[in-house]
Every structure is written in C-alpha cells, then in structure tokens.
Swiss-Prot record:
The keyword Heme applies. Cytochrome P450 monooxygenase; part of the gene cluster that mediates the biosynthesis of azaterrilone A and other azaphilones, a class of fungal metabolites characterized by a highly oxygenated pyrano-quinone bicyclic core and exhibiting a broad range of bioactivities. The first step of the pathway begins with the non-reducing polyketide synthase tazA that assembles one acetyl-CoA starter unit, five malonyl-CoA units, and catalyzes a series of Claisen condensations, methylation, PT-mediated cyclization, and finally releases the first hexaketide precursor through the R-domain. Heme binds at residue 433. Belongs to the cytochrome P450 family. Transmembrane segments: none annotated. The lineage of its organism: Eukaryota, Fungi, Dikarya, Ascomycota, Pezizomycotina. InterPro entries: Cyt_P450, Cyt_P450_CS, Cyt_P450_E_grp-I, Cyt_P450_sf, Cytochrome_P450_monoxygenase. This is Cytochrome P450 monooxygenase tazI.
Length: 489
C-alpha cells in the first residue's frame, strides 16, 4: 500500500512538473513570445482583469503602450495595438478581423443582436433590416422630438439652478438621452425630464449593464449562476424581466397604433423598423425586444457622458467658453440642427470632446483571421485576440500633440489624414455605431441650447464638488467617479 501511495505521489509530481515545463516552453517559444510587453502578461491575464474590474483598463493599457510601443502583449493570448494604420486595417469594411469572444459573453444564452453577434453575415443581414431607422435621413425626421426634449432639459436645468444654486448637468443629460432614445425606440418617453428622477427602467438598465461587465470579465460566473442562486444575478434577472415586459408592452402598443392609424402615424424609429421586420417574418418578437433594448443601452449613457465632459471641459477654460458662447449666439431664434452643423467652432469643440473623453474608451477586441496578419511589423498568428482602444489612438502624441493635458478645439481646424484615421469615437468600418447620427444631433442641439441659455457658466465648488468627481471610471462605458457634474450658471 505504501508503495502504491508513493508511486501515486511521484506520478502527480511528475505530471505537475511536465505541465509547468510545458507552460514555460510555450511562454518562451510560442508565436507571441517575441512581442513586447510586461513579463506577467506572458503568464496570466489576471493583472489585466484586475484593472478591468477596477474601471482602469484603458489607462493601464495606455501606460503599457508608453513603455513598450504601439503593439503590446496584455495577456497570454491578447494584444493591443495603438497604430492608426493597423487600426484602419483591422476595422475597415470587409475586414476579416471579426468580433472576438468578448462579445459572446454579453448576452450569455440570449439570442444574438446587432451588437453582440460575432458572425459577419448575421451582422450584415441584421444591419440591413434595422439600419434604415437610424440612418441620417431617418433621424432628421425626428429632429422635432430631439429638439423639444433638449429645450425641456435646459429649462429644467434653469429651474434647478434657481432652487439649488448650481446644476448637475450629468443627471440632466442622462435624463435627456434616455428619454430621447426611449421615445425613438419604444414610441414613448420615460418622462424622466418631466419628473426629475430616474424611471424604474433606467434603474433596471444600470443593474443589467453592471452585470454585463461581470459576464464579460468572469464568464464562468454566468454558468455558476444557472445552478447557484447568486443574489446579484437574481436581482439582475428580475430587472431583465421588467425590461423585457416593458419592451413587449411597447411593441404591442405600437402594433395597435398601426392597426388603428396606419404605419405613417407612428413616430418610433426603431420600433417601426423592427415591427416591419416582424411582419415579414425576419425577426421574432423576442429578437425585436432585444434589439430595441439594445438601442436604449447604446443611446442613453453614451450621449450623456459626452455632453457632460463637453460642458465640464469648456467651463474650465474661459477662452474656449467665450468663443463657443459667441458663436452659438449668432444662431437664429428658431435654429435647426443644420444651422448648428454649419458652426465650425462648435463642431471642433464636439470633436475635441469625443477625442479626449470618448464614451467608449476601451478595447474593441477582434480575432486575427486564420491565416494570420502582419500588424506594426509583427506577424500575428490566426485566432489571437487583438484589440484597439480609442483611449490610446486618441492620445498618440505623434498625431495629437500634448494629447492628455490640452483640450484644444483648434487642433481640428485642419485635421491631418492621420488624425482622421485615428479618430474613432463611434468605432469603425461596418461595425460603426448605428446610433452615430442621433448622437451627433443630440450633441449639436444640446451644446447650442445650453450655451445660448447659460452664457457664463463655470465649474462649481458647491457641495464639495471637485475635479476628482470627474475622474473617469472606465468599464465598457465611462462614468464620472462622483456620478455628478456641478456647474454654476
């Protein structure tokens, strides 16, 4: 018996030794061994996951680029590239760098959506079905809805300033963006602007969005939660059911509206396209609900974050603020989005905000095609995950001088080709954000109305507000650390 036990122990030791030696061999001789990066990245991705969970991944990866150059190994099987030519190659239309495994964990077992699908044929087909509703031409038809909500938002800000002595622009921009995309997606506003508080749908959305971070960082927890009732997952499941129910009610309401008044009377862009697709048998009702819900996720916090950092950055610099105020003051009383679009300085302020404070600053992971690819003079084998993050692309000092410390709209007076190639606040290629045109319209109209109404705003110090409140927590989306942005007007 003792002999058997000793032999078993020796076998285990030998097996462990073989595994360790195999790992060491692969680390130092594998196809990624020659790539620059910290030594720890060759062995484990835990350091990267730690920074991801702490909301710090883009800053961590940017520091690695500053140390190791434009291509860096950030985990055993993942690289990050900060090079405009490589990014253009990866994200161009018809690129064979398809979305990576990261996206497969977003919906877990839910049907795939336009955003979460990794299949290019599925994505192309679904985008053809849904893209028309969010095209620039279609969004123009909804300008009155967007403009009305922007005006209501600024009116509510003015009332808060009288009552509170300052404005929390982050709160109001969140209400604006969510109410707007809610009406365009479901045909009915959440009425957060009128009530001055978050709706149940918005609170549910926050919980489900946080769960998405956990799923993509620790996908095994989703599988565990199927058998073990983890409290947070249980709460998120209840929130998901409420959101699903709201979407179902909205779609049924839309269908009844069509039956009574015809499709031409319906105002909901996403619901109109999705219901038309359902009538053709292209999408199930469950798929329509998921796509409409995806519009809410993509179209709420993103625009609000951009507007918040735009106002904060402008108010910190009196020269920029005064130039912007002077330009929007030239608009006619009943100005339109086209009028704002024609303002060069306003456009530069918006672009500089999207450069320095993109709402989605982190990785856009893609899988290298099976035959491999050469990126930044390095051959990368097929199947490796390669990411590009706009946080780094937008901070390349060779392309954007003094990129971190200087909020400079004038850098966009005559942008270089490299600046245009590196500028990707809405993604790139066939995967460019479907809501880009709506986001741009919201940014233009909200910026113009805010700085026409408030002509000398400054960053507040009331209620203990400091720049530390605006420190960015970077998950998939950015959020200010203090979840507020106080402005004196």
């Amino acid at each position: 018996m003792a002999y058997i036990q000793a032999s078993s122990t020796q076998a285990v030791v030998v097996l462990l030794l073989v595994l360790v030696l195999t790992k060491i061999y692969r680390v130092y001789t594998g196809p990624l061994a020659h790539l620059p990066g910290p030594a720890i990245s060759k062995w484990t991705g835990l350091v990267l996951q730690k920074h991801l969970f702490a909301g710090n991944r883009p800053r961590y990866v940017q520091k690695l680029h500053q140390l190791y150059g434009p291509i860096v190994r950030i985990s055993p099987d993942e690289l990050d590239v900060s090079d405009s030519a490589a990014a253009k190659s990866i994200h161009r239309v018809a690129s064979r760098f398809y979305k990576g495994r990261f996206y497969e964990h977003i919906g877990h077992r839910s049907p795939k959506t336009l955003f979460s699908s990794t299949d290019p044929q599925f994505h192309a087909y679904r985008r053809r079905l849904l893209g028309g509703a969010m095209s620039e031409t279609s969004i123009r038809q909804h300008e009155p809805t967007v403009a009305q909500k922007v005006k209501l938002c600024v009116d509510q800000m003015a009332r808060e300033a009288e009552r509170r002595g300052c404005i929390d622009v982050f709160k109001w921009w969140c209400f604006l963006a969510t109410d707007t995309i809610g009406e365009l997606s479901f045909g009915e506003s959440f009425r957060m602007l009128e009530k001055g508080e978050k709706s149940q749908y918005s609170r549910d959305l926050e919980l489900v969005s946080t769960l998405m971070i956990i799923r993509t960082t620790f996908p095994f927890l989703s599988r565990v939660a199927e058998y073990v009732p983890l409290p947070y997952f249980k709460q998120a499941a209840q929130s998901g059911k409420r959101m699903f129910g709201y979407a179902s009610e909205s779609i049924q309401r839309y269908k009844k509206h069509v039956e009574m008044k015809g499709x031409x009377x319906x105002x909901x862009x996403x619901x109109x396209x999705x219901x038309x697709x359902x009538x053709e048998g292209s999408l199930t009702e469950a798929e329509i609900r998921l796509e409409a819900g995806g519009y809410i996720v993509a179209g709420s916090d993103t625009s609000a974050i951009s507007l918040t950092y735009l106002v904060w950055a402008v108010c910190k610099n009196p020269l920029i603020r005064d130039s912007l105020v002077a330009e929007v003051a030239t608009l006619p009383e009943d100005f339109t989005d086209d009028d704002v679009r024609a303002l060069p300085y306003t456009r530069r302020v918006i672009d500089e905000t999207l450069r320095l404070y993109p709402a989605v600053p982190g990785a856009l992971p893609r899988a290298v095609p099976p035959e491999g690819a050469t990126l930044v003079d390095h051959f990368i084998p097929g199947g490796v995950t390669v990411s590009t993050q706009v946080y780094s692309l937008h901070r390349d000092p060779k392309i954007f001088p003094d990129p971190d410390r200087r909020f400079d709209p004038d850098r966009w007076i005559d942008p270089t080709t490299e600046m245009r190639d590196s500028f990707m606040p809405f993604g790139g290629g066939s995967r460019t954000c479907i809501g880009m045109h709506l986001a741009r319209m919201e940014l233009r109209l909200a910026t113009a109305h805010f700085f026409r109404r408030f002509t000398s705003p400054t960053v507040s110090t009331k209620e203990g507000f400091t720049d530390d409140d605006m420190y960015q927590h970077m998950y998939f989306l950015v959020s200010p650390k203090g979840h507020r942005c106080l402005i004196d007007v």
